[in-house]
UniProtKB/Swiss-Prot annotation:
Organism whose genome encodes this protein: Bacillus cereus (strain G9842)
Pfam families: AIRS (PF00586), AIRS_C (PF02769)
GO cellular component: cytosol
Record's keyword terms, sorted: ATP-binding, Cytoplasm, Ligase, Nucleotide-binding, Purine biosynthesis
Molecular function terms from GO: ATP binding; phosphoribosylamine-glycine ligase activity; phosphoribosylformylglycinamidine cyclo-ligase activity
Protein name: Phosphoribosylformylglycinamidine cyclo-ligase
Reaction equation(s) it catalyzes: 2-formamido-N(1)-(5-O-phospho-beta-D-ribosyl)acetamidine + ATP = 5-amino-1-(5-phospho-beta-D-ribosyl)imidazole + ADP + phosphate + H(+)
GO biological process assignments: 'de novo' IMP biosynthetic process; adenine biosynthetic process
Amino acid sequence: MANAYKQAGVDIEAGYEAVSRMKKHVQTTMRKEVLGGLGGFGGMFDLSKFALEEPVLVSGTDGVGTKLMLAFMADKHDTIGIDAVAMCVNDIVVQGAEPLFFLDYIACGKAEPSKIENIVKGISEGCRQAGCALIGGETAEMPGMYSTEEYDLAGFTVGIVDKKKIITGEKIEAGHVLIGLASSGIHSNGYSLVRKVLLEDGELSLERIYGRLELPLGEELLKPTKIYVKPILELLKKHEVYGMAHITGGGFIENIPRMLPEGIGAEIELGSWKIQPIFSLLQEVGNLEEKDMFNIFNMGIGMVVAVKEEDAKDVVRLLEEQGETARIIGRTIQGAGVTFNGGTAL
């Protein structure tokens, strides 16, 4: 039967080898609350040790999008898993939740053990950065659905927060200060446009260094999404945070308003932070309008935090002590949407 399945394109032995290879990486993510080991039908996590008055579970799921195609082109698969974790855990930490565990789903045309191992190695690294355990996953070999070189990757996370400490943004008022945490680069959104502008229309090479970039283009584009969990959780222990926004698809324009109550807008001070060269390259090569850039990309800011004005400098200092690059980038105002430099609302 195994031979018949292999003739149909599914290599069971390769799947077993991939699982064997990934175990050592998964083990590095374990927390004391995890029950059982890799290979069970379901992952188990003990919540009894959490001393919360009204514990609330917060879940999130996401993928990496067409950034995967850059990984295929560069044949580099050991960091794309970090992106999958980041996209999930950053989404739930903005609500004040501590990520507890993570599960992954890999669908591929052919299960190559070394490639699967590298993907899971990256996922495990992301979990370590976020402090969550990789307690399960699925690797589905689907010949005919994907080519032999292709795969898709998605992740799922669950976190916990005390109900009274959930961050909703509903208490944000005009005059609160917006602090931006620097991104590592493009992160995991907008890659369909990136490929069209830089690779298809611009015909740029992944191996070359362009403009003010410090790395070859391929390495720049595959920089992993920054995981903000640990510095944000440390911040929440010491300061009151009124709202947070993970700057993903939709950029500043779509994501900052998601944390704001009705009647409150955001005024962003352009020039208050460094916009990385990769965004300048994209805008120049693609002849893109600034409005479009801020409506698609993170433009150098991956997370925005709203705090009281009197706390702002201390919050920046704490975040910098945690290794982040943090800047005061604006404030909340009466109104709606996002305004730049007090000028045109984009």
